[in-house]
Regions:
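Flexible, glycine/charged-enriched surface loops at secondary-structure junctions
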Residues: 43-48, 150-157, 253-259
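Conserved active-site and cofactor/substrate-binding residues in soluble primary-metabolism enzymes
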Residues: 27-31, 71-78, 86, 104, ...
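Active-site rim beta-loop-alpha module in soluble metabolic enzymes
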Residues: 132-190
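Generic non-transmembrane alpha-helical segments
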Residues: 141-149, 204, 243-254
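Zn-dependent metallopeptidase/amidohydrolase metal-coordination segment
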Residues: 199-233
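Short acidic/polar active-site loop segments enriched in Thr and Asp
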Residues: 89-90, 192, 211
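His/Asp/Glu-rich mid-to-C-terminal helical/loop segments that flank catalytic regions of hydrolases
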Residues: 222-259
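Metabolite-binding pocket within alpha/beta catalytic cores that recognizes anionic/polar moieties
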Residues: 1-141
């Protein structure tokens, strides 16, 4: 591949080996990075380029980082590829989602065990038959974190999409028939929630041989709203962030024990 940037510097993230830790939290929103970095010790801004912001600090004596991915699979896959090239190998995606399963309420936490590949990025990495699955170690660490912190937590499959408004206003789309029929299938299959990055992260992680898991704050659930059930709308992501940070602590402790 032709080198488009300074030697050793990743083209999009503007980082190089040594800038990030082995463990990285991946929010979508660049503005969440500083908030997450507050949970680290001695956190410092490493890079800020396009939608990609990176801070590095320490957690329980281990070098850790947070890097934003932007929205969707293409930018998330770029972030993961360049972080792995810079030395990272364990990742926790943290963000927001919309509930699908009727039992999932706004303010709850969802932990993805796998993702439905209704986006386009992963088709350039693997045949459509290949599953997008989270790493077992990371899922376990997230579940343990959610339990320890006392949050209402749901683990299961999430739907990963490219069009935000294709979910929320499918009836106005030219392919409304397909979107609405598939949405009914996801409901019958008890899919927990809908979001936009996990499928890409899981498939790219399988390709690169690294560990990735995802956790989300549920903003709300349109199915509960349609059914006339309580449907709180929650935007504060601190609960999901604390789950992600605690999961990193769990992984650090587990990896040290297994070393």
């Amino acid at each position: 591949m032709q080198n488009y940037s300074e030697e050793g510097l990743q083209y999009h993230l503007n980082i190089r080996k040594g800038d990030v830790g082995k463990y990285v939290i991946l929010p979508g929103d660049p503005k969440r990075c500083a908030k997450i970095a507050e949970h680290f010790e001695d956190a410092k801004l490493v890079a800020d380029n396009r939608e990609y912001v990176t801070y590095t600090g320490y957690l329980d004596g281990e070098k850790v980082s947070v890097t934003s991915t932007g929205i969707g699979g293409p930018s998330a896959s770029i972030a993961l590829e360049e972080l792995v090239r810079s030395g990272a190998d364990t990742f926790v995606r943290v963000g927001t989602c919309g509930g699908i399963d009727i039992d999932v309420k706004g303010g709850d936490i969802v932990i993805a065990t796998g993702a439905i590949r209704t986006e386009g990025t992963t088709r350039e990495y693997a045949p459509i038959e290949f599953p997008a699955v989270a790493n077992y170690d990371v899922v376990t660490a997230l579940l343990q974190a959610g339990k320890k912190l006392g949050y209402t937590t749901h683990a299961g499959i999430v739907q990963c999409k490219d069009s935000f408004y294709g979910q929320h206003e499918p009836e106005v789309m030219p392919v409304s028939y397909e979107l609405q029929q598939k949405w009914e299938a996801w409901k019958r299959l008890r899919v927990k929630a809908s979001e936009m990055e996990s499928a890409a992260l899981f498939v790219v992680a399988s390709h690169l041989g690294v560990r990735v898991g995802s956790t989300f704050l549920v903003v709300g659930n349109q199915e509960r709203n349609a059914a006339g059930l309580e449907n709180p709308i929650v935007h504060d992501t601190e609960a999901a962030i604390t789950v992600a940070v605690q999961a990193l602590r769990n992984l650090i402790a587990q990896d040290r024990q297994n070393a």
